[in-house]
């Protein structure tokens, strides 16, 4: 980055700018953007990935919250006909305004760690638009995303993301790849929305509710954590052992519990 493009990272935006050329190249090779691709980059920062994505010929929209970076990015990529910059909060961004065809949008980003989980949930609400996602995240978050049942990393984030997507933990990135260096290790993850949900719930909102309630007190048994939603008999009717703890259940079992809740008679209304 030349002097004219220098910008001090801001702690309140969770900014850690990627500068390691080897890591940048490895990320770009993992994404493998093509001229026909429709790309969205969240939090381009100083444009470390942006330059390579534009070089692929893909149409690239970028969303950046930091107003001070907007003129820097506009100047840096002036004249690039495949570059379109949006200043705003990605957590509030309406992805439908991009006009991308269903299942075509490729999303990438070095996500600020303080908003990564809510941003992923926001993107999952638009999973029908998305072909794949490649993110730099805190390594601990990627381990939770990719976790399986039975361990401490398995929880609400794992289950709800895996309900919608296939998760691939690609590789880890050390603090030295960033300026300033974060205090934690990072990792690259690939999320690919399922073309057909492997375990479709009758109502995914009820699945979210079941999972949230179950993991609010993850050391307790299911018959205790879910007693406000399902009786012990209803848990057993879903083919689930109520004496288990939530981390012992796989995604399919949580979907059965949600479907059991969906099948409950609705209270009569006047």
From Swiss-Prot:
Signal sequence interval, chain numbering: none
Binding, S-adenosyl-L-methionine: 16, 18, 43, 64, 89, 110
Pfam family, any one: RrnaAD
Main localisation: cytoplasm
Recorded catalytic activity of this chain's protein: adenosine(1518)/adenosine(1519) in 16S rRNA + 4 S-adenosyl-L-methionine = N(6)-dimethyladenosine(1518)/N(6)-dimethyladenosine(1519) in 16S rRNA + 4 S-adenosyl-L-homocysteine + 4 H(+)
Keyword rRNA processing: yes
Database matches in NCBIfam families: ksgA
Protein purpose: Specifically dimethylates two adjacent adenosines (A1518 and A1519) in the loop of a conserved hairpin near the 3'-end of 16S rRNA in the 30S particle. May play a critical role in biogenesis of 30S subunits.
Name used for this protein in its record: Ribosomal RNA small subunit methyltransferase A
């Amino acid at each position: 980055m030349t002097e004219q493009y220098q910008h001090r990272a801001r702690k309140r935006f969770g900014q850690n700018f990627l500068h390691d050329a080897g890591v940048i190249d490895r990320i770009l090779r993992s994404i493998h953007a093509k001229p026909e691709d429709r790309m969205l980059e969240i939090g381009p920062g100083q444009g470390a990935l942006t330059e390579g994505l534009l070089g692929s010929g893909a149409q690239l929209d970028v969303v950046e919250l930091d107003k001070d970076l907007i003129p820097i990015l506009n100047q840096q990529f002036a004249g690039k006909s495949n570059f379109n910059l949006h200043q705003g909060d990605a957590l509030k961004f309406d992805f439908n305004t991009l006009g991308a065809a269903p299942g075509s949008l490729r999303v990438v980003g070095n996500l600020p760690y303080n908003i990564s989980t809510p941003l992923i949930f926001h993107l999952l609400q638009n999973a029908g638009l998305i072909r794949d996602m490649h993110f730099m995240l805190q390594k601990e978050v990627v381990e939770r995303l990719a976790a399986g049942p039975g361990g401490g990393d398995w929880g609400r984030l794992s289950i709800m993301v895996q309900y919608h997507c296939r998760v691939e933990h690609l590789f880890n990135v050390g603090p030295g790849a960033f300026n300033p260096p974060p205090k934690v290790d990072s990792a690259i993850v690939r999320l690919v929305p399922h073309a057909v949900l492997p375990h479709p719930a009758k109502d995914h909102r009820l699945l979210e509710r079941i999972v949230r309630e179950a993991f609010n007190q993850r050391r307790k048994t299911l018959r205790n954590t879910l007693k406000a939603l399902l009786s012990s008999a209803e848990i057993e009717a879903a083919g689930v052992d109520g004496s288990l703890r939530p981390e012992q259940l796989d995604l399919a079992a949580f979907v059965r519990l949600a479907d059991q809740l969906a099948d409950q008679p609705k209270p009569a209304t006047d």
